[in-house]
Each structure stands twice: as C-alpha cells, then as structure tokens.
Amino acid sequence: MAYDVIVKGAKAVRKGGTERADIAVKDGKIALIGPGIDENAEQVVQADGMYVFPGAVDCHVHFNEPGREEWEGIETGSNMLAAGGCTSYFDMPLNCIPSTVTAENLLAKAEIAERKSAVDFALWGGLMPGYTEHIRPMAEAGAIGFKAFLSKSGTDEFQSADERTLLKGMKEIAACGKVLALHAESDALTRFLEAEYALQGKIDVRAYASSRPEEAECEAVQRAIEYARATGCALHFVHISTKRAVLSIQQAKKDGLDVTVETCPHYLLFSFEDFLKKGAAAKCAPPLRSEADKEELIGVLAEGLIDMVSSDHSPCHPSLKREDNMFLSWGGISGGQFTLLGMIQLAIDHGIPFEHVARWTAEAPAKRFGLTNKGRLEEGFDADFAIVRPEPFTVTKETMFSKHKQSLYEGHTFPYRIAATYSKGRCVYQDGGRKQSGAFGTFLKPSEIKEPIL
C-alpha cells in the first residue's frame, strides 16, 4: 500500500507507554503503527530522536469571534494552537458578540470557523438567565456541552447563572445527555471581598488575589456537586486551582456522580510570586496561587486525581490589561500555544511518564466529550499528532503565534519544542511557521455513545 505520510524513527507516546515506531497515514487516518514501515509514501518524515504525541484536544479556549476578533479571532487562534501541537479545540460561548446561547448563534459561529479554522473545533453552548429554553436546540445543533459561570464572567453580554437558572438548566442539560462546564467561584464571597477592598482603596495584585480565595472555589464546587446530585446533571469543573477542590470532586466521583475536572498549565508552572512580577499579563480567575498550593496541585495531578489539562486561552487587546487597577484589568492568560510543552516540562521535572501527558492533553478530553476518533495514536484514529524535538524553546514575541504578543509565558524556556503538527494527516505547522495556509478544520460533534466516568 502507498501511504500519504510516514513518520519514521520517532518514539510514539501511546496509552500503554512510549515505543519506537513508525506511523503511516492514509486518507487522514492513522493506517499503521509499527517498526520499520517500508512502503512508499508521498511524504516521509525522518523523526529520529523525536517524540510523537497525540494532537492535543484543548477543551477550553476563548477566540472571541464573532464580535471581538481584535482580541484574537479564529484564524490566528487556531494557527496559534497548531504551533503548540493542538489539533482540536472547544471554543467557549462568551467573549464573542453575540454570546453562543442559541442554536442560531452556535451555527453562525460554526460557519465562521469552518471558513477560518486551521484545525478541528467544537463549540460550547452557554447557560445564561433567560435562555434555558435554547439548551435542547443547541444540543441538537451539535454543542459539545454547556458552560455557566457561578460568579461574574467579566463581560456584560454573558451573565452568570442565578440559582434558578442553574437548577433549571442542569435538569435540561441532563435530559439532553450533555455535560455542564462550570466556572466555580462563589459570587457572594468574591463580590463581598471585592467591595471590602474597594472601601479600603486597595486595587493592587495582592488585593485582587485575596478577593478570590480558595474558599470561593471550594464553596462553589461543593454547591454545584449537591445540585448535580439533585438534578442528575453531568459536570465538568474548569480551571480548578486548589487541592481541596480537587478532593471534593474526587469524593463526588466515589459517590457515583458523573463529574470531571481540569486544571491549566499556568496553575502548575507559575505561582502568586509570578503574578507579583508579571502584573496584568498574569491576571486570571481563579488567580495564581501560592507556591505551596501549586506544589499540592501538581501532587494531585500526578496521583491521577485531575482528569485533564486545558489552556483556558483567554486573550484580549493589550490596552485592557491595566496595571493601575487589577480589579478592572482583563482577567485571562494568553497561553494556548504552550499547553503540551508545559505538560512535557512538568513530566520531565517530576519524573512522570509521557503517556500521562498524552492522557491529560488528548485522550481524556476526547473521551469525556465523545470524540471517538481523537486523542490517541491508534490505527483507525484521526492522524492528529505533534512531533516534538528535545531541544529548548524560549517564548519571545517573535515565537508567539497569538494575535497579541502579551503573555505570562514570555521569557519562559521549555525543554522541548514543537517540530511539526499534523491534523488529519496534513502538516499545519512546521517549526518556525505555518506549513500549509488555509482552513482545514471541521466542526466536531460528540458521539451519541456516552462514555463512562473517567
């Protein structure tokens, strides 16, 4: 058989471990994995000494289109992800205008992404007051799941879910067999603390971080878990930043609830000290935690208590990253390009096998959200993979692919670099630049088969 692509001599990072193997691609699928594949191919990639990881599945990005393309946009955002070894992403329903809270809005965004996205994509629908009747139509239109905020979202267009909206929405989402992703921070506690600091005239990094303490995350997580018991709704907790919240979620799993949890590289690689040094570029919600909190989070990740890692790429125009008032500064990290590299660094630093990195960044999100042909280097799966070279990579403005070159990661050096990224057998990134320009992404809709709890 003649193949389209053969990657030769690499170490393939697979579910059972890392093995030296060639990978043959035909018609966008992995056709064969094994040693010494000698058949002809249109393209032969010599990858001796390199690793091949499954293409990352980033279940949490904000590309802000339509309506706020000046913040990022689907074209620049998807090419940025490709430069980081990511071959599928789930775009969140907020920061765009209009918010993705109706089937009409969801399909309009999908049409834009089909024209602009370099890699495959899925779309979250939004759970927002006044829009619960749109949940089923969005599910039928292909929403990967639904997203709600338990505290203010940061944009006027996407309101946080009050208790009635949350409970009504959870019942409907459960009836549709979908998953609700939650930004879990207590609205009451964060608003109270923010007002207290405002009265004292405290608006700096320390005040902002103190206004969103561990207790705010843990209270919201526990309340959502109890609501899940009452409604039967499957939950996915996004960007969890503390060990205590992770342990609450694990207890819910032991109790039989259908819940999963993600964290983000910035909570694993950086700490509050970096927030003090970097300022607004490092502002996010929840905020970066203490060094001790970071080490505890790494510990529960290494123990297998966190299901997956996503970027929560949430950029903005640099003018919104205000240094004079941290409460008014945009809260979001521009970091989608660095998730896979960050997790490889973490694995090297802590002696964690690379197959765990593949699970966190690819297999687990694909499985959780019903993408049955994604997330693993297996015959018959989509030929989505990243070739990674063990050579240092320093983040500079010149090596960032996001629209705006402002990031917490600037100046950071990773031990490995992305040599190339393939989406369905097509090279969409090669070290130093885009390989094939154009929009090759397709709209991913979840399988009807409901996977078991991870």
Curated annotation (Swiss-Prot):
Keywords: Hydrolase, Metal-binding, Purine metabolism, Zinc. Zn(2+) 2 binds at residues 147, 183, 239. Pfam families: Amidohydro_1 (PF01979). Pathway: Nitrogen metabolism; (S)-allantoin degradation; allantoate from (S)-allantoin: step 1/1. The modification N6-carboxylysine is found at residue 147. It catalyses: (S)-allantoin + H2O = allantoate + H(+). Its EC number is 3.5.2.5. Its cofactor is Zn(2+). GO terms for biological process: allantoin catabolic process; purine nucleobase catabolic process. One of its GO terms (molecular function) is cobalt ion binding. The keyword Magnesium does not apply. Belongs to the metallo-dependent hydrolases superfamily. Allantoinase family. Homotetramer. Catalyzes the conversion of allantoin (5-ureidohydantoin) to allantoic acid by hydrolytic cleavage of the five-member hydantoin ring. This is Allantoinase. The lineage of its organism: Bacteria, Bacillati, Bacillota, Bacilli, Bacillales. The gene is allB.
